[in-house]
Amino acid sequence: TITVIVNFSFLENTMSSTRVIEKISKPEGKLFKLKPMNNEQNIGFNYSYLFFNHNINPKIDDGFIYILPYKKEAQMFVEELSYLGSTYSNKEEPKGWKSYSFTSEEVQKIFPVRKGIVIDVVRDYNVDTTKLFTYYNKMNSVKIEHNDGTIALYSGFNKDEIYVRVGDVVYPKYNTLGNTEVYDARKKHRINFSLFYYSTKNDIKLSSLSKNNQTEIIYITPTFYQNGESIKLKKDFFYES
């Protein structure tokens, strides 16, 4: 989803607002329409526009229950990841920071946690299994946007075994995103997962947005369905899907 803001510096023969905000998810089509006050005269206008490659300030479904991202009856070990920006570059931890690492002794098929549209795929990296890594950020990944504007990031795929493309609609337990790969000399399989959305900073209204540094990422701690219950994942536990 792209957020588009159109600013009119001059309008003639129309009652349109001088600032129009639209959120679009299709590659082409009509953005909006100006209607004349007098059908016998032309509409006059001058405009400029901004666009942001995100759905900013979406209406989040706080009660949504997510599905664990691996096949039924499989078990994976859950760890919580620290925010590396604070450790290595003095960046402030994002609001709500939460990122999980699901690990396994064997390759796992990874599925989406809810229905969504694939918006980004990275399949550029090979793994070095001769070393041990404290952290590893060069990971093949899939990013999926959901219909409430949240975005899920899955990282840790075998670059030759990612099965989706940008624009694909994917469903939990039905569409395999890809297969995990070992990430260092410990020979464990890992998939990292986080859920987030984009928001304006400091309660700035969307209608007042003028540049990218006025937005921020806010992370969500998802609720998952597991064994007939709705749960928050605890670190250092095995969970069966």
Give the location of each predicted region.
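Short acidic, flexible loop segments centered on an aromatic residue
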Residues: 1-14
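Surface-exposed loop/edge segments in extracytoplasmic proteins
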Residues: 13-19, 151
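Surface-exposed, glycine-biased beta-strand/turn segments
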Residues: 20-138, 226-241
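Acidic, glycine-rich catalytic/binding loops that coordinate metals and/or anionic ligands
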Residues: 61-66, 72, 162-168, 175, ...
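Short, acidic/hydrophobic/Gly-rich beta-strand patch recurrent on exposed beta strands
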Residues: 100-101, 141-147
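Short histidine-centered loop motifs in beta-beta connectors
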Residues: 105, 111, 146-174
